[in-house]
Structures are given as C-alpha cells and as structure tokens.
Amino acid sequence: MITPNMDLGYLGRKGKYPECGLYAMNLKSDIIKNFLKEFQRVYDDAENGIFLMEEWHDSYVFEQIKNKFPQMRQLDWSAHLYDLRPRAGATLGEGHPLINSDWGAWLDHLKGSRKKLGRSNQEDLKVARTESYWK
C-alpha cells in the first residue's frame, strides 16, 4: 500500500526502530535501490557494518540504514498511533502496530500468546475495527 510517488511504506514506532514484519518498497526508485545495496552491504561486510551498530537485529539495522536516506519519500502506516495515549513507559506506536494500521483489515500478526490463541486480543486494538474478523 504505497503509491508510485512513495519510496517506502513501513510500520514505524516513534522514537524506536520500526516493526519489520511488513514493509513495501518501490523497486523502481533509485533511492530504494541504493537503500537495498547498503542494507545488504552491512550484512555482507559485517565487520564494517552491523557489528559496528549498537544492535544487530533486522528492525534496528533497517532503521539505521533508513536514516541514511533522509530524502526517501516514506509512508509510516502507524503514524496515526503516535497521538494515542500510550501506557506508562511505552514507545508511541509500539505494541501491535500492524492490526492498528490499515493492514489490520486484512492481516493479523500472531506470535507468542496470540499464536496459541489463534488471533490477537481485543485489548491489542487501539483503533476501531469494523471487519467481521474483529467482532
């Protein structure tokens, strides 16, 4: 869900690295082509790449590389969550950004206790969902 004038769509978390379980890239974009080259380079040349970073997991690395391209036209699918009142100590947009974005109309993200339950908890919803799946 990005338009041709966008380079990247992702599920952000304000003040923290994004949720990288889902993102979209405009592969015709020169900025994205350069982003992907750098993203691969930091893994292929780990001694001069990810091993120089504070954290090595995909979401952190993704954010570090994304920040190297400030001209990238980005769409943060979870930006609307940043204005919601978070629980004490929470990062804005954290929790379950996928189901609270437009993607929640089609996708659920099951891991941990949600995987055992077979669906996300109603308490995970921060926005009203009208789809039958969520009723």
Language-model features: where?
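Short, solvent-exposed loop/turn segments at the edges of secondary structure
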Residues: 17-18
